[in-house]
């Protein structure tokens, strides 16, 4: 292979925190890790969400050190002739415009990449951090997001339509399920609008690959589905065999209301779980971190927890809410509390899951103990974590789990909020896709 064909990829810390073994995934190319990245990984070793990934990345570097003796010179990685080294030099800031010559870690990473490019190398800065990629573009460096863990997002909504004979719909209503050849290839738990001339029905594919009837009169804690998607979602939430339910959709489509009602139904009425635990990520609109807000932890959590209580106030009476809280049947916690816990006999709701990186989301799912279920609510158009793209995080988890009998996903379509809220949400959706990665 020619020297010109080999590219040089400079990795920042965000890449290694998302995939500790990222250095081994660049085929025959040269991977460069600036020294400041090692320092940033060290600083993240005890982070509540990212600490494990930082330690794994550092352990990988240490294993390479033990094998090769030193890392300041290229050492072989992978099976396709790629190399890796920790860059100690190329720290002359004069290659950058004056405005970028500072002591920030971003500036140090940019300096390494710019110096390597000045030597004639084909350099690409790889980062999951949007601001750093923008800065790289501002100084004329090629930059890209880390794609090795991306999945091809199919746009699967968990719903489909199917034309069938009127007799098939009659059979479905009479027997509660029907074996349809056209439905056997659909992912498990896909909702189906069955159209049979003048008659129609709603069903979903069960684990046996048969279509079972979804009743329109089912309710959870007094809440009934208004749309086909909501009715399928309710049916899935009431099915104890489905351990992970994903509810997507724009703001106001009823994701949180359905999840909370299903949780209260499970705890108070059906008693299949002991308590409802709601985890919310610590990202506000604008990305403000919880630690910068004044007050104790409970006071800091107030605004985050209040969003859950606002939803509950529209669904249950004050007396019911008081009973749930006084008996410890409802907890609203920051996601920092998940690591180290095993959640047994709990109905777990991960709210705003679109702001979670895939590794963090998998950590959450790994905490589930015996008798627990989890509901993920998310809207990928409202990501507050700049390290999460449209093709990773919860979107990647959905694509990986799609079709498994323990997993179901539904994208809710119809807004249940005021006409004003629906209008504004629609406008934001029209504006944002071109601007978002």
Curated annotation (Swiss-Prot):
Q: Which key words tag this protein in UniProt? A: ATP-binding, GTP-binding, Hydrolase, Isomerase, Magnesium, Metal-binding, Nuclease, Nucleotide-binding, Toxin-antitoxin system
User: Do you know what upregulates this one?
Assistant: Part of the phoAT-phoH2 operon.
Q: What is the effect of changing residue 339 to A?
A: No longer unwinds or cleaves 5'-tailed RNA, decreased ATPase activity
Question: EC number(s) in its UniProt entry?
Answer: 3.1.-.-, 5.6.2.5
Top-level lineage group: Bacteria
Q: Which reaction does it catalyse?
A: n ATP + n H2O + wound RNA = n ADP + n phosphate + unwound RNA; ATP + H2O = ADP + phosphate + H(+); GTP + H2O = GDP + phosphate + H(+)
- Keyword check for Isomerase, yes or no: yes
Q: Name one Pfam family in it.
A: PhoH
What the entry lists under InterPro entries is as follows:
P-loop_NTPase, PhoH, PhoH2-like, PIN-like_dom_sf, PIN_dom
Limits of the PINc domain: 7-134
Q: Name one GO molecular function term.
A: GTP binding
Q: Which GO terms describe its cellular component?
A: cytosol
Describe the outcome of a gene knockout.
Knockdown of expression using antisense RNA decreases the growth rate about 10% in liquid media. Deletion of the phoAT-phoH2 genes has no visible growth phenotype in liquid media.
Cofactor(s) it depends on? Mg(2+)
* Domain observations: Has an N-terminal PINc domain and a C-terminal PhoH domain, suggesting it has RNase and nucleotide hydrolysis activities.
Which family does the UniProt entry place this protein in? In the N-terminal section; belongs to the PINc/VapC protein family.
Q: What does this protein do?
A: Toxic component of a type II toxin-antitoxin (TA) system. The possible cognate antitoxin is PhoAT; the toxin gene can be expressed in the absence of the antitoxin gene in an endogenous mc(2)155 double deletion. Unwinds and/or cleaves 5'-tailed RNA in vitro that starts with 5'-AC, the reaction requires hydrolyzable ATP; double-stranded (ds)RNA and dsDNA are not unwound or cleaved. Has ATPase and GTPase activities.
Q: How does it assemble?
A: Interacts with antitoxin PhoAT.
Q: What is this protein called?
A: Protein PhoH2
- Native organism is Mycolicibacterium smegmatis (strain ATCC 700084 / mc(2)155)
